[in-house]
Design a protein with these regions (language model features):
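Active-site cavity-forming subdomains of large catalytic enzyme subunits
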Residues: 130, 164, 188
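Phosphate/diphosphate-binding loops
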Residues: 155-182
Length: 235
């Protein structure tokens, strides 16, 4: 199945957890308005506005009183005009930014966690070369959204970010100026650019971790094997 994995765009290689380095990386928080059906806004803050076309949901902590009334409701993304739900997940940080975040596929590992746990759609827009895909996503149906996406097709994430931020300023969907921040970001140990999370075809083996019947069957098959030394059978 298609699944996310860490990717270094410079070395053009997948990166294992053992090869990761977490480093401080400068960026900017952009306060962006999504809109309800009555056009009232709800604001999120993001360091990666170029991923707006890949947004699949807004996520807040289930105990956050500010957003409890909105769980299950739909909002529309700015510029690209795609409807997404507001959902609850315990990994959301109430004291970070606006306390509600957009989940995009994929900006970071938290996006991957939300995508898996909440069974969200896959809307990947970054290629292995680190550039925006050249094909128009089928979930963008609004003419204005299509026109803007055509402007970022094939661009680097840095160039796409500038185009999207300029468009947000022009549309009035960005509240104030971007605020500088520093965050911990994953790098390949040999690389000098932050890792991207791209999707690729991957194969999985069922090991019985979530299936008790399969687990019992595999244990019985394991008893048919000879282990040397025998105590390694239960390791």
């Amino acid at each position: 199945q298609d699944a996310p994995g860490l990717w270094d765009v410079t070395f053009q290689t997948a990166v294992a957890q053992a090869e990761l380095e977490s480093r401080e990386y400068p960026g900017f928080y952009h306060r962006i308005a999504f809109s309800f059906e009555d056009d009232s806004p709800i604001y999120i803050e993001t360091t990666r506005p170029e991923l707006l076309p890949a947004c699949v949901a807004l996520i807040a902590h289930p105990d956050d009183e500010r957003y409890k009334p909105y769980f299950g409701k739909m909002v529309t993304s700015p510029l690209f005009n795609v409807r997404v739900p507001i959902l609850a997940h315990p990994a959301a940080e109430m004291d970070k930014g606006a306390g509600i975040a957009m989940c995009c596929t994929f900006g970071d590992q938290t996006d991957v966690e939300w995508w898996r746990d909440l069974h969200l759609p896959l809307r990947s827009i970054i290629q292995r070369n680190g550039r925006i895909v050249m094909d128009m996503p089928d979930w963008i149906t609004d003419d204005a959204g299509k026109e803007l996406f055509e402007q970022i097709e094939g661009k680097t994430t840095f160039s796409a970010r500038k185009i999207v931020v300029d468009a947000l300023r022009e549309s009035g969907d960005m509240d104030g100026d971007p605020k500088p921040t520093t965050r911990m970001t994953n790098f390949y140990e040999k690389g000098d650019k932050p890792l991207e999370i791209v999707t690729s075809r991957q194969w999985y083996l069922q090991n019985g971790g979530t299936n008790k019947a399969l687990n019992a069957k595999l244990i019985e098959r394991g008893k048919e094997l000879n282990f040397h030394p025998d105590f390694m059978r239960v390791r």
